[in-house]
Amino acid sequence: MSRIKIILLACMLALLFSGCVENSAVFEKNTATLKENTINADSVRGYDIASANNAFAFDMYSQLTQQVTGDYENILFSPYSISAAMAICYEGAENTTKEQISNVFYFPTNKTVLKVRLERINDRINSGSGDYELQTANALWIQEGYPVKEEYLFNVKKYYDGEVANLDFVRKPDDSRNTINEWVETRTSDKIKDLVPKSMITPDTRIIITNAIYFNGKWAYTFDKQLTEKRAFYPANGEEASVDMMYMYNNFNYGENSKAKIIELPYKGNDLSMYIVLPKDNNIKEFETEFTINDYTELKNEMDSTVNVDILIPKFKFETKTELSDSFVEMGVVDAFRQANFSGISNSPLKVSEVIHQTFIDVKEEGTEAAAATGVGMTVGMDFSWDSKQREFKADHPFMFFIEDRRTNCILFMGKVEYPEYKNDT
């Protein structure tokens, strides 16, 4: 007898998530009255969710680089979005299934510690200023009539602020797919479309978990469009390309060591920043293989805010869609896809069948839109000259980038630019 399937979706993009789409499915309000979990406050404080999220980010990045087959394949993902969706899955996992998810995502064995910390950090992320848009959203889509435990639903609603809806995957798969895709589009300002393909929903589908994170922010110091011009960019294979390169001269947090340079580009409001890590040698594949979370932390600790920096970085815009099941299995989450134990969700057998992660990013002069960025002095086309108090950050070859929430120290987005193609919307 085949096991009933649970589908996990993680989508990360950019922009404000608005109201629910109109459909026969009705979202339940957070009115559950089950007794809340209690736990020692010291146990909650002892778990550093940012460190766990960031460690997973580097593990996930390593897996994604192994999937790259072409010379110019950019990478973008949201470790926070993936972790948040898997945390909802973890809430119902038991025994070996729970242990494997815990090991890969650095989750504490005590589920209450995790959900209390996630609830607090989600509240902080979703309570930003009016200087930018940053919001997360969770939803649990359940087959009509499928028995899900009341305690699980209560925890999803309370601690994960999850919306819950019943759909008919069996008799109305197209309607169900359209409802979920419209939910995603609404919460990503139409940047992510058709997340759920027709082939995903089958008669065995019982639950779909979705998470979305959206960010739209302006730079604290915007790049002057008049200083953007075509300049040379050198992909890893050495073939020169002409790309739109933005220029700015200003005071920024900047650091370097023998292998790389790093710069922090803050967004308006100073709650979030983009960090760009530029290898000194044009060999991104060798660099990323050796670059660890500890290296990243140490490089950030080298940053100095007292120097002026001449910056050249390319505009870039791209989107990705990745199926992560094989990556998760390689990382150690095996039973969830095979001999799963999700008895905390339902007494009926469940297993994860697919994990889809779809992303979008747009980095230009004004800032960054991600789903999931004061030029002074030099005239366009002039050669640059440097003095001892200046630093140069010339991103004319492949680099890594991170978008972090400075309030929580969480890496929300992580990626790599191999080739900075930029196409304006038509």
UniProtKB/Swiss-Prot annotation:
Any one GO molecular-function label of the UniProt entry: serine-type endopeptidase inhibitor activity
Sites annotated Reactive bond: G381, M382
Protein's UniProt keywords contain Zinc: no
Entry keyword annotation includes Signal: no
Lineage: Archaea, Methanobacteriati, Methanobacteriota, Stenosarchaea group, Methanomicrobia
Pfam families linked: Serpin (PF00079)
Protein name: Uncharacterized serpin-like protein MM_2675
Family listed: Belongs to the serpin family.
Entry keyword set: Protease inhibitor, Serine protease inhibitor
Listed GO CC annotations: extracellular space
Species of the source: Methanosarcina mazei (strain ATCC BAA-159 / DSM 3647 / Goe1 / Go1 / JCM 11833 / OCM 88) (Methanosarcina frisia)
